[in-house]
């Protein structure tokens, strides 16, 4: 099935949560917190202003984003658990920067 979000909505694939704590303790599924990070897999065309002009979204497919703990609506599409939320629920885009030798020193 193909799903196309409307207006300023985006479809998010939630990032995988950690299965082990920093101290090495294995965390059971029932105690895991859901990650607040995910990948944008579909975007709507944008919202409209008072004059009817289309305002495009800032996020695009493939962006890694951060969102609030209670943001979005959980849905299952083609057997995959996804989130649908408005762009305003997204806190920011995570920049995938690779550390250089100068930055590492």
UniProtKB/Swiss-Prot annotation:
It comes from the Bacteria. The keyword Chaperone applies. It comes from Rhizobium meliloti (strain 1021). SMART domains: Cpn10. The gene is groES3. Keywords: Chaperone, Cytoplasm, Plasmid, Stress response. Pfam families: Cpn10 (PF00166). This is Co-chaperonin GroES 3. It is found in: Cytoplasm. Belongs to the GroES chaperonin family. Heptamer of 7 subunits arranged in a ring. Interacts with the chaperonin GroEL. InterPro entries: Chaperonin_GroES (IPR020818), Chaperonin_GroES_sf (IPR037124), Chaprnonin_Cpn10_CS (IPR018369), GroES-like_sf (IPR011032). Together with the chaperonin GroEL, plays an essential role in assisting protein folding. The GroEL-GroES system forms a nano-cage that allows encapsulation of the non-native substrate proteins and provides a physical environment optimized to promote and accelerate protein folding. GroES binds to the apical surface of the GroEL ring, thereby capping the opening of the GroEL channel. The keyword Cytoplasm applies. GO terms for molecular function: ATP binding; metal ion binding; protein folding chaperone; protein-folding chaperone binding; unfolded protein binding. GO terms for biological process: chaperone cofactor-dependent protein refolding. One of its GO terms (cellular component) is cytoplasm.
């Amino acid at each position: 099935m193909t799903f196309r979000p409307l207006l300023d909505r985006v479809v998010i694939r939630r990032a995988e949560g950690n299965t082990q704590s920093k101290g090495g303790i294995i965390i059971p599924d029932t105690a895991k917190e859901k990650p607040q990070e995910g990948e944008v897999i579909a975007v709507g065309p944008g919202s409209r202003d008072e004059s009817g002009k289309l305002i495009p979204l800032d996020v695009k497919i493939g962006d890694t984003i951060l969102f609030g703990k209670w943001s979005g609506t959980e849905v299952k599409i083609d057997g995959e658990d996804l989130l649908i939320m408005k762009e305003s629920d997204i806190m920011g885009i995570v920049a995938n920067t690779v550390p250089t030798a100068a930055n590492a020193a």
